[in-house]
């Protein structure tokens, strides 16, 4: 970094380029040096002559002439007198634009405080002097005295309590102290003067030393905080070279008059800029004060005037910051200097970040179906206006006009040669089209204009989805790029034919929609028994001839030869084939093409052929689609909407079921909640059933050529949900608050709704409209925050050289897959080698970029977790390196240095924001509830392993889960079997694990990477995924028999309590095999092998129909070369379908399970939480008193009375069931929650695992689930949830300490003896029990886990994993695809600061938040000098805070909190190095990304002369 030299920006010598901008406090001398004269009078202009008053606010002598090169009195006119000062009116003869830059000043009679440094928190003046802000205000506004010199004054007669400097006194105290101690040098005064004097004498260095001393010696946290605050302010003054007294103004600068203009309106009135009014008040009061002082007026009057002056200056700088705002003539507050720069209408956002530009126009858009992909239709009249300068030059160059005037005349007369020339200019000249709102980079694209008649712009139908445009009156803007470079960028980077992929996900966005899809779908559909079915044709020409001579139907199934193979296809599909490039395989086009299939087709063509071929292909596809949707003439009539006959029957049945539920409820068998839930479930199922029948009916109507069905099925328009409302039943509706009305709408729109149904459905319709309006604003604000936080992230280097990465798996919630692994790793770079789990060879090495091909190989190898590089672990000094980012989604290539990945990330997340929902889901609130989960089912084959699992067996032989946590049921397949009887030894060495089996004579050892094994906290379900990891069933030192598996691969896992709750009934025993239908993963020959040690041994003679009793059997499919193409584990009990050495195709069934129904792992009662007896023994009740804490309920069916705990329990009672075990061990207490039903009697003997009581689930408070946009905001803002879960910070054993003040105390003790205590509110549900082992990061209470806790307990990678999966859940559920890397970039920005814990010898202060970059730099410096480095902890900051605390002042100021940012910057004299995008846009330089980076590298853009 070169030494930066400050430059004065005067009028004449504006520097060409600025390297950096520094913000500082201006000293009075500085302000005077800017000024061209003092403004003495409040007058503006003389209303008769309309000339500025001398010495007034618009004075020509001070600010410069009003007309170019002409003095005010008119003595000197013309250029030749430039620089002469007129002796009569004192005006310098120069250009009038100096009135935009020349400043004046006002000399104040008394110093006043600058309100920003008094009132903006923390108050700088107050903090510096150590005076409270309120007190400081009282002093400045002449209501209190501040002690300047205490002399020997005391507050009391015993002289115990001395008066200190800076004490603030009221009138009474002051009078008394003056009386007693006036002669001892006691001095206290009020107002700006004394504050200025105090600031002048303030010794910064001494204060700094003193405070550092105090800091070391103090123990109180509160005191430390105040000291740190003061230290920060003092330090900023010391480092910046600012003087504290400059925060007091003695001279007020006056803004140049052209920046606060007077505009003459018609009718002799003037529109005055508010700032003038505010200046007038300052001048008036200042002059009056001057006179009063000259007249020696009474103190009280002077004091009042001084106070008014202070208020006037306050209003000028920041009106309304303190007290009431000064209002103008029309009763609205005046806009002060601060207001002019802040907010959406302020200088930053209105004029600097976005400007209106020349050479632009806008008009309505219409569809242009005959344009090429890179063309747009531009109305001639618009082109004429936009290209006028070009046209004038062209007319002269061609010799049609000799002068400019003549050329202008020709254009006005619209002569024919004009159009000729215009056409020449427009050829090969791109224009930019933009549609507001510009949500992502595809909202501005370049096109080659085609001149058209008419006044509307024509837009190509395929780019509509990128612009989000439709033709119902949308408007678009046209911009003309002017410089050679801009034109080159338009042609190379911005042409619409280059922007086929969406930057958010890398999927094609220029995909046919609506009519085009319908036409293509129709073409590719098969019709049974159509004309010409089963005929054989030689080639497409023959087919076309047959079609034209009406010998063949378009949809007939025919045979023809493609790639030397005879295949079945249809004539229509061959027409599609004719426009496809040759490299597209048959399976992609020879099927019914729906919207998804067409998108896949486009993706494939792009991947194999590149943008040029794709653009051509898309145009052909568009032509084809439009042609055939027109020819077929598909249309809807009411008769195409078919209502199923079975509807009546289904509804009768549902009503019957509902009646039964109601009866059970009245009999007291169900709680209100259960009744409601069950009824909702019944109607949801019925509605789905009716919809299913309806879709079946429509599908079979007219052989599948029913128009309505075709539109929905092809994805052209409408969905099954909409058709369901037209022809099925409308189903359940929600009330405005989100709860579901339990009576559904039975009618559909074809039958018509009755009055009540109509009324119920109006809620939803109106809410939908209101939501949409709110949503747009929220999504826009989210985008703005994201852009601001990420705008400085760009690709700065090719490779940062890190070996770190984050291990990722697919994202799933319960059984629902949110984002598959292939989507997550596609386009990323590996951080570790990937091993083939079967052959143990390296599949791909570290540093490989995964394209689709490689991704597919990884998934086919059965790998479940991959470690990839990510922006969060990137070590690049600024920005991110290309390897940590991976593929540029919009190009399908590795990203290039200079790419503005931050902005792209922000746009990719923000743009789909409008598609997200806004609502907060209530439990049981959405109109499509999924039935409660009541069991888990195995989906893979293998055998069962219990991990840490304790169970109870009941009398009737049921197995019940006894663990509450830290246990799991695993489904595994063997990886290594013991070769002989022996003892296992497991030994970790560095990052490897050695497993040895020995028995004295024989010994074998196997080694694995440590990271391949599932960690205990993963098995317990605290973090990460376990599928695909290795598991060791035996601990070190265990003896095993030959044939036992000693290393296993986990295929599925269900942890407790997340997947299987406490007291669930287990349906599988440890070691039990689980069989599934096994389908071959490849084409080839099946050979059977048996696992022996860690290798496979051939196992011959397996026959079809045989039931497998062998352990460790594998079916291996060998391809033509005899290599292993796929491997399948065959569990015991499977029935073989394919004998040894037989050939199979892909997807052939190899083995079948012994029993046909699915394997249930565990099941439980979803509506209640049971309490079970942990031992045999006798029950006694405690505090269970009928009528006080409990109520007796008689069961009508059994006649038994049962006790239920009341909903509200008096505070002094704690109802509990106490169990005294038979074996005499310690008694066990079960504390009962409200609403618990008790299933035992007092004094009863109970058996092991008997149910003692049940708490209904609904009583476990139903919390609202935040979904959609609010959830995304919540995550990015890093808001702490309302009541967050308390999270364990260390691994250890739980115990309960003695409660304090009604709070429960949880103590966690680690093996090392370290303990952590937590106090927990009594109304929180505690999820852990005494003596249980918990992992760091595990929840101890109910509630949402906060991101801050994850970061603190599990670290940055776990936090990233959590953030990405939470945000992806929201977007994926709405069907939006966003690549993970975009979210990771934002998260890395949220983690860019650290909090100093211990400052060592650095300049930091504990509690400081500093950027990681600064922290590293400072520590390196201190280490070089041999000092003690600082220690910091990572913190998570929300995007708003991250954007405001940006390193760049200008960027932060233009985002939010403008005054606060500028105050902070000026006090600490911050320098903005103009490294990022926003600052450069504001200053008006090229932005330093993409092609703008080469500006510094002196690369010249050579344009080839156009022949």
UniProtKB/Swiss-Prot annotation:
Question: Could you confirm whether the keyword Zinc appears in this record?
Answer: yes
For this chain's record, the cofactor binding note is: Binds 1 Mg(2+) ion per subunit.
Q: Which reaction does it catalyse?
A: RNA(n) + a ribonucleoside 5'-triphosphate = RNA(n+1) + diphosphate
Residues given in the record as Mg(2+) binding sites: 470, 472, 474
This enzyme's EC code(s): 2.7.7.6
Family matches, as HAMAP family: RNApol_bact_RpoC
Described purpose of this protein according to its UniProt entry: DNA-dependent RNA polymerase catalyzes the transcription of DNA into RNA using the four ribonucleoside triphosphates as substrates.
The name of this protein is DNA-directed RNA polymerase subunit beta'
Taxonomy of the source species: Bacteria, Pseudomonadati, Campylobacterota, Epsilonproteobacteria, Nautiliales
């Amino acid at each position: 970094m070169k030494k930066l030299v400050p430059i004065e920006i005067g009028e004449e010598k504006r520097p060409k380029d600025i390297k950096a901008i520094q913000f500082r406090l201006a000293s009075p001398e500085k302000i005077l040096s800017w000024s061209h004269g003092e403004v003495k009078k409040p007058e503006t202009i003389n209303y008769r002559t309309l000339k500025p008053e001398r010495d007034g606010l618009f004075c020509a002598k001070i600010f410069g002439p009003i007309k170019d090169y002409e003095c005010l009195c008119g003595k000197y006119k013309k250029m030749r007198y430039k620089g002469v000062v007129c002796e009569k009116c004192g005006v310098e003869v120069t250009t009038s634009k100096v009135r935009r830059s020349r400043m004046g000043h006002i000399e104040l009679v008394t110093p006043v405080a600058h309100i920003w440094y008094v009132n903006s928190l923390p108050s700088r003046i107050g903090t510096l002097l150590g005076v409270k802000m309120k007190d400081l205000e009282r002093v400045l506004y002449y209501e209190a005295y501040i002690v300047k010199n205490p002399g020997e004054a005391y507050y009391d007669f015993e002289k115990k309590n001395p008066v200190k400097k800076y004490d603030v006194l009221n009138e009474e105290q002051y009078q008394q102290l003056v009386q007693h101690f006036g002669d001892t040098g006691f001095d206290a005064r009020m107002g700006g003067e004394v504050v200025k004097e105090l600031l002048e004498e303030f010794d910064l260095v001494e204060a700094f030393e003193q405070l550092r001393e105090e800091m070391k010696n103090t123990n109180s946290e509160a005191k430390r905080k105040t000291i740190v605050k003061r230290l920060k302010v003092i330090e900023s003054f010391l480092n910046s070279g600012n003087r504290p007294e400059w925060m007091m103004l003695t001279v007020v600068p006056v803004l140049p008059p052209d920046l606060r203009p007077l505009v003459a309106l018609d009718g002799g009135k003037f529109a005055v800029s508010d700032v003038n009014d505010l200046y007038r008040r300052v001048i008036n009061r200042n002059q009056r004060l001057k006179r009063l002082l000259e007249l020696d007026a009474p103190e009280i009057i002077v004091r009042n005037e001084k106070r008014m002056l202070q208020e006037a200056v306050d209003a000028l700088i920041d009106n309304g910051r303190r007290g009431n705002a000064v209002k103008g003539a029309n009763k609205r507050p005046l806009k002060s200097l601060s207001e002019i720069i802040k907010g959406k209408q302020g200088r930053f956002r209105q004029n600097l970040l976005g400007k209106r530009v020349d050479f632009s126009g806008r008009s309505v858009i219409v569809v242009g179906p005959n344009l090429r992909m890179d063309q747009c239709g531009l109305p001639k009249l618009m082109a004429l206006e936009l290209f006028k300068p070009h046209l004038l030059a062209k007319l002269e160059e061609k010799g049609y006009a000799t002068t400019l005037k003549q050329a202008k005349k020709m254009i006005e007369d619209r002569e024919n040669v004009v159009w000729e020339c215009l056409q020449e200019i427009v050829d090969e000249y791109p224009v930019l089209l933009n549609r507001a709102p510009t949500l992502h980079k595809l909202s501005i694209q370049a096109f080659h204009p085609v001149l058209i008649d008419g006044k509307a712009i024509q837009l190509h139908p395929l780019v509509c989805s990128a612009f989000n445009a439709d033709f119902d009156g949308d408007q678009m803007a046209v911009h003309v790029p002017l410089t050679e470079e801009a034109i080159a960028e338009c042609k190379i980077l911005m042409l619409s034919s280059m922007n086929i992929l969406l930057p958010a996900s890398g999927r094609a966005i220029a995909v046919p929609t609506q009519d085009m899809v319908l036409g293509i779908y129709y073409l590719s559909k098969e019709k049974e028994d159509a004309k010409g079915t089963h005929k054989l044709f030689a080639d497409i020409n023959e087919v076309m001839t047959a079609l034209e001579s009406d010998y063949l139907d378009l949809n007939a199934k025919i045979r023809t030869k493609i790639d030397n193979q005879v295949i079945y296809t249809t004539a229509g599909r061959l027409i599609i084939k004719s426009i496809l490039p040759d490299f597209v395989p048959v399976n992609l086009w020879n099927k019914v093409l729906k919207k998804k299939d067409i998108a896949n087709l486009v993706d494939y063509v792009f991947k194999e052929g590149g943008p040029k071929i794709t653009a051509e292909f898309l145009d052909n596809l568009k032509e084809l689609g439009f042609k055939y949707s027109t020819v077929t003439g598909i249309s809807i009539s009411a008769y195409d909407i078919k209502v199923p006959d079975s509807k009546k029957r289904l509804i009768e049945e549902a009503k019957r079921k509902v009646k039964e539920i109601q009866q059970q409820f009245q009999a007291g068998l169900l709680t209100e909640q259960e009744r409601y839930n069950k009824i909702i479930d019944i109607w949801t199922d019925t509605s789905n059933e009716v919809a299913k029948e309806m879709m079946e009916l429509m599908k079979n109507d007219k052989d599948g050529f029913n128009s309505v069905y075709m539109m929905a099925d092809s994805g052209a328009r409408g969905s099954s949900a909409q058709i369901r409302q037209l022809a099925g039943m409308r189903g359940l509706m929600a009330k405005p608050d989100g709860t579901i009305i339990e009576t559904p709408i039975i009618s559909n729109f074809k039958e018509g709704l009755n009055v009540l149904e109509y009324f119920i459905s109006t809620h939803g319709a109106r809410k939908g409209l209101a939501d949409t309006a709110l949503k747009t604003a929220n999504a826009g604000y989210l985008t703005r925050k994201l852009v601001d936080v990420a705008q400085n992230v760009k690709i700065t280097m090719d490779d940062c050289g890190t070996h770190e990465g984050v291990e990722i798996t697919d994202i799933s919630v319960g059984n629902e897959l949110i984002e598959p692994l292939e989507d997550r790793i596609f386009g990323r770079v590996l951080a570790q080698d990937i091993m083939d789990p079967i052959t143990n060879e390296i599949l791909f090495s570290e540093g490989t970029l995964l394209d689709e091909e490689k991704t597919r190989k990884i998934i086919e190898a059965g790998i479940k977790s991959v470690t990839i590089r990510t922006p969060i672990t990137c070590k690049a000094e600024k920005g991110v390196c290309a390897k940590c980012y991976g593929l540029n989604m919009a190009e399908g290539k590795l990203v290039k240095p200079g790419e503005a990945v931050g902005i792209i990330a922000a746009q990719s997340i923000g743009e789909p924001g409008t598609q997200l929902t806004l609502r907060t889901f209530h439990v049981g609130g959405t109109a499509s509830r999924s039935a409660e989960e009541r069991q888990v089912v195995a989906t893979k084959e293998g055998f069962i392993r219990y991990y840490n699992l304790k169970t109870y067996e009941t009398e009737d032989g049921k197995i019940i889960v006894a663990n509450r946590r830290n246990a799991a049921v695993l489904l595994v397949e063997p990886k290594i079997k013991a070769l002989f009887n022996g003892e296992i030894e497991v030994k970790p060495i560095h990052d490897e694990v050695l497993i040895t089996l020995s028995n004295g004579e024989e010994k074998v050892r196997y080694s694995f990477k440590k990271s391949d094994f599932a960690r205990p906290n993963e098995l317990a379900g605290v973090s990460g995924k376990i599928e695909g990891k290795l598991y060791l069933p035996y601990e070190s030192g265990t003896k095993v028999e030959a044939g036992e598996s000693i290393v296993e691969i986990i295929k599925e896992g269900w942890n407790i309590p997340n997947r299987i709750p406490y007291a669930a009934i287990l349906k599988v025993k440890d070691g039990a095999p689980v069989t599934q239908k096994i389908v071959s993963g490849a084409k080839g020959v099946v050979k059977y092998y048996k696992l022996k040690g860690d290798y496979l041994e051939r196992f011959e003679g397996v026959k079809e129909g045989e039931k497998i009793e062998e352990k460790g059997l594998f079916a291996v499919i060998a391809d033509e070369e005899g290599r292993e193409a796929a491997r399948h584990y065959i569990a015991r009990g499977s029935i073989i379908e394919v004998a040894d050495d037989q050939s199979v195709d892909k997807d052939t069934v190899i083995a079948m399970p012994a029993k046909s129904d699915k394997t249930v792992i565990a099941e439980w009662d979803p509506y209640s939480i049971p309490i079970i007896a942990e031992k045999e023994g006798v029950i006694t009740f405690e505090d269970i008193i009928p009528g006080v804490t409990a109520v007796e309920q008689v069961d009508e069916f059994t006649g038994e009375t049962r006790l239920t705990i009341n909903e509200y329990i008096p505070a002094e009672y704690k109802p509990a069931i106490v169990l005294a075990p038979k074996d005499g061990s310690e008694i066990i207490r079960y504390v009962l929650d409200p609403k618990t039903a008790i299933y035992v009697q007092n004094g009863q003997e109970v058996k092991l695992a008997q149910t003692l009581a049940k708490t209904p689930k609904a009583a476990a408070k139903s919390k609202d689930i935040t979904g959609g946009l609010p959830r995304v905001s919540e995550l990015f803002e890093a808001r702490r949830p309302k009541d967050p879960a308390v999270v364990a910070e260390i691994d250890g054993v739980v115990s309960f300490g003695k409660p304090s003040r009604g709070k429960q105390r949880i103590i966690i003790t680690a093996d090392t003896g370290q303990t952590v205590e937590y106090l927990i509110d009594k109304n929180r549900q505690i999820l852990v029990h005494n003596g249980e082992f918990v992992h760091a990061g595990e929840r101890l209470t109910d509630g949402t886990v906060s991101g801050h806790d994850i970061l603190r307990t599990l670290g940055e990678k776990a936090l990233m994993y959590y953030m990405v999966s939470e945000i992806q859940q929201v977007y994926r559920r709405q069907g939006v695809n966003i690549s993970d890397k975009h979210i990771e970039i934002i998260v890395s920005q949220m983690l860019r600061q650290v909090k100093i814990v211990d400052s060592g010898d650095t300049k930091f202060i504990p509690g400081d938040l500093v950027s990681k970059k600064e922290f590293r730099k400072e520590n390196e410096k201190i280490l070089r000098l041999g000092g003690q480095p600082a220690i910091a902890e990572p913190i998570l900051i929300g995007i708003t805070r991250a954007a405001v605390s940006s390193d760049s002042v200008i960027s932060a100021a233009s985002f939010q909190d403008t005054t606060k940012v500028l105050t902070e910057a000026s006090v600490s004299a911050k320098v903005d190095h103009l490294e990022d995008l926003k600052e450069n846009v504001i200053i008006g330089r090229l932005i330093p990304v993409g092609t703008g980076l080469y500006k510094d590298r002196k690369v010249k853009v050579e344009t080839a002369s156009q022949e």
